[in-house]
A protein has these predicted regions:
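Basic, Lys/Arg-rich alpha-helical nucleic-acid-recognition elements, primarily the DNA-binding modules
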Residues: 1
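Structure-specific DNA junction-binding interface
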Residues: 4-329
């Protein structure tokens, strides 16, 4: 029975992933809680604009644990290796990489006794993508549109001024090329949730995914300012650099803390974008993906070995990320 459940996706991968786009008499309910309007969904998932000022980025330090740093590395990497994917897909795929890495680490250090679901064959039949050393099972989001309708595109074409036959042919060739390169949006499949659902009495028939909303929320709250950085601007007792931010004498509101974390995320995303951009000019997408994990390992926060370091936090100097950039020739 379990083997049959593992292979269930072979029988219904296309049908399951296209439910939201199927025509119905009544207004269809959103799949996985997402709005039916793809453009609105993508707008709601937008991350802070990356800070690309090298001086600002190079002087910044963030305080975090390893998992959200993996997530940030992966979601920015996919911006370069899979640029045709919407942000919802990049967040879902990056969360898949992060969760799979955390699961393997937990098993390795002995705090989780169950083997990773992918090693037991769960998700067999779903397409595979290799991202930062991980083989991620994905589900195609058939029919998902997020960049505007063909009617809008056609209206733009009609509104353009008359052009020569040669220019028309050139425009048609460019349009055909864009159509060929357009990717089908993807979800990362949550194999651990799939195993849990299929081995429980009340298992769901849906193929579970990593929700983009959860990945975004994780990123938005994960990057604190080290204590030593806060001390420079606030009247607080001196603490050792690298510890959690101390409580200042003047109360810091939740809104202030959230804005600070968002700013730190902007700085981190900027550092990663500058790193990937420097190498994307000389490496193909596969080679860029292969190097990403090694770059992460070189800058990840130092924590205690084994179970003692699980969830541990430390400082990440963004200048260390910038130092990994390719030197101009």
């Amino acid at each position: 029975m379990l083997n049959a459940a593992k292979r269930q996706s072979k029988k219904r991968s296309a049908d399951t992933s296209s439910v939201a786009s199927a025509p119905t008499a009544k207004r269809a309910k959103p799949t996985y809680g997402q709005p039916l309007n793809g453009a609105d969904l993508e707008a709601s998932l937008a991350l802070p604009e990356p800070e690309l000022d090298e001086k600002k980025v190079g002087s910044a330090v963030v305080y975090t644990n390893r998992a959200p740093l993996v997530l940030a590395f992966a979601v920015t990497l996919l911006k370069f290796t899979m640029p045709g994917q919407p942000i919802s897909s990049r967040l879902s795929l990056a969360q898949a990489v992060t969760s799979m890495n955390s699961k393997s680490k937990a098993v390795h250090i002995g705090i989780d006794k169950d083997q990773p679901a992918e090693e037991e064959g769960w998700g067999e039949g779903q397409p595979l993508l290799r991202i930062m050393t991980r083989e991620v099972r994905v589900m195609k989001r058939w029919g998902y549109e997020w960049e505007g309708s063909d009617d809008t595109t056609q209206q733009k074409i009609k509104s353009e001024p008359d052009v020569s036959n040669g220019e028309k042919e050139e425009n048609k060739a460019k349009k055909d090329e864009v159509e060929r390169e357009r990717e089908i949006a993807l979800w990362g499949v949550d194999l651990e949730a799939l195993r849990k659902a299929q081995t429980s009495r009340n298992g769901s028939s849906n193929l579970p995914i990593y929700p983009a909303q959860s990945a975004r929320a994780y990123l938005m709250k994960a990057f604190e300012t080290p204590a030593a950085e806060v001390i420079k601007t606030e009247d607080v007792d001196v603490k050792i650099e690298g510890q959690a931010v101390p409580k200042p004498k003047g109360k810091r509101t939740a809104a202030v803390i959230a804005a600070e974390k968002e700013h730190n995320l902007s700085l981190l995303l900027g550092a990663l974008e500058l790193l990937y951009e420097s190498w994307a000019k000389v490496l193909d997408k596969d080679d860029l993906d292969k190097r990403a994990w090694g770059w992460y390992v070189r800058v990840r926060p130092d924590v205690a070995q084994g179970a003692a370091g699980w969830g541990g936090k430390g400082n990440v100097k963004l200048s260390d990320i910038l130092a990994l950039r390719r030197l101009p020739s």
